[in-house]
């Protein structure tokens, strides 16, 4: 096996009002009563109950946001949530410790690694790249060219779903579909959720 491929999309929080700096794209697309059908079979993760930068929040506010977000999503989807995506990439040792104490197995930051390494710390899970960055396509092509070695590789791409409505460069649904088509159906890649990629790494590392 060459490696694992995993993807993360963030959607606009239902019922949360923001003064978004890019009002020319629609953020609230899927009604709450349709989300279970739309996201059936997908892994669900928290992102802050009110999109708070948890690393900059007071301890009580941080804990309340994590607890409320986790409880709401678990009630809606009827599943246990074990993953988190830091809003604005904001985190801290206290935030990470609290997430682990609440049963979280991983949490993603936004700063790209530009490579294919598994995370040393799943609570500080760095993606390979954002899908809308100019280097995303080149990174995917480099991943496909890599020869299997002693260590498995991880291609981890993320984006906000509304960014695909920008219709500029990589930030379009057309570009996204072409990229996924270019990497789909390969026997040397395991396509998995964020949670599964973390579990695979921990198992191989004997942790």
Feature-to-residue mapping (PLM):
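Well-ordered, non-membrane alpha-helical segments in soluble/globular domains
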Residues: 25-31, 66, 136-141, 172-179
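Short, surface-exposed basic-aromatic patches at helix termini and helix-loop junctions that form
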Residues: 97-104
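Metal-dependent polysaccharide deacetylase catalytic core of the NodB/CE4 family, i.e.
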Residues: 1-95, 114-124, 153-164
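Gly/Pro-rich active-site loop or hairpin
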Residues: 123-131
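C-terminal domain-boundary segment and adjacent tail
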Residues: 6, 74-75, 106-115, 159-207
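A generic secondary-structure signal
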Residues: 68, 72-76, 142-146, 182
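A Trp-anchored, charged/polar loop motif used as the substrate-binding/catalytic surface
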Residues: 130-147
